[in-house]
C-alpha cells in the first residue's frame, strides 16, 4: 500500500475548523483521494492499529469534515486515515457512504450528550 500517489492530492494542509462555537480543531489535510473530496489525517503509531481500535479517529475526522463543509461550502463525505508505524509499515483506512454517515451521526450524538450534561 502507498499513501498519496497518483491522482491524489492535498489541496489544503493544517486547516483550522470551528463549528458554531461548539468545537474546533485542525485537520491535517483536505484534498482529493480516489477522485473524491476527502478529509485526510496522518497518524503515527508504535504498531499499526486495527480498525476497531481507532473509532475516535473516525469520529474526530467526521467532526472536522462537517465543520469544513459548513465553513467553506464543501461536500466532504470521505475520511482517509493514513497510518505509519516504527517499522515503516503502512495502512490506509477509508470511510465513506453509510459508514461516514454512521460516524457523523455518532459524533453529533456525543456532542448533544456533552452539551446536555453541561446544562
Question: Where is each model-derived feature located?
Answer:
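Single conserved hydrophobic/aromatic residue that forms the stacking wall/gate
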Residues: 1-11
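Mg2+/Mn2+-dependent nuclease catalytic core
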Residues: 15-117
Amino acid at each position: 500500500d502507498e499513501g498519496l500517489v497518483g491522482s491524489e492530492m492535498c489541496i489544503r494542509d493544517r486547516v483550522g475548523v470551528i463549528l458554531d462555537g461548539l468545537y474546533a480543531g485542525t485537520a491535517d489535510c483536505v484534498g482529493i483521494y480516489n477522485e473524491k473530496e476527502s478529509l485526510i489525517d496522518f497518524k503515527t503509531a508504535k504498531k499499526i492499529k486495527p480498525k476497531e481500535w481507532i473509532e475516535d479517529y473516525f469520529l474526530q475526522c467526521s467532526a472536522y469534515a462537517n465543520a469544513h463543509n459548513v465553513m467553506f461550502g464543501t461536500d466532504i463525505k470521505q475520511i482517509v486515515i493514513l497510518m505509519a508505524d516504527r517499522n515503516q509499515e503502512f495502512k490506509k483506512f477509508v470511510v465513506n457512504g453509510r459508514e461516514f454517515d454512521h460516524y457523523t451521526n455518532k459524533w453529533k450524538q456525543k456532542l448533544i450528550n456533552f452539551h446536555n450534561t453541561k446544562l
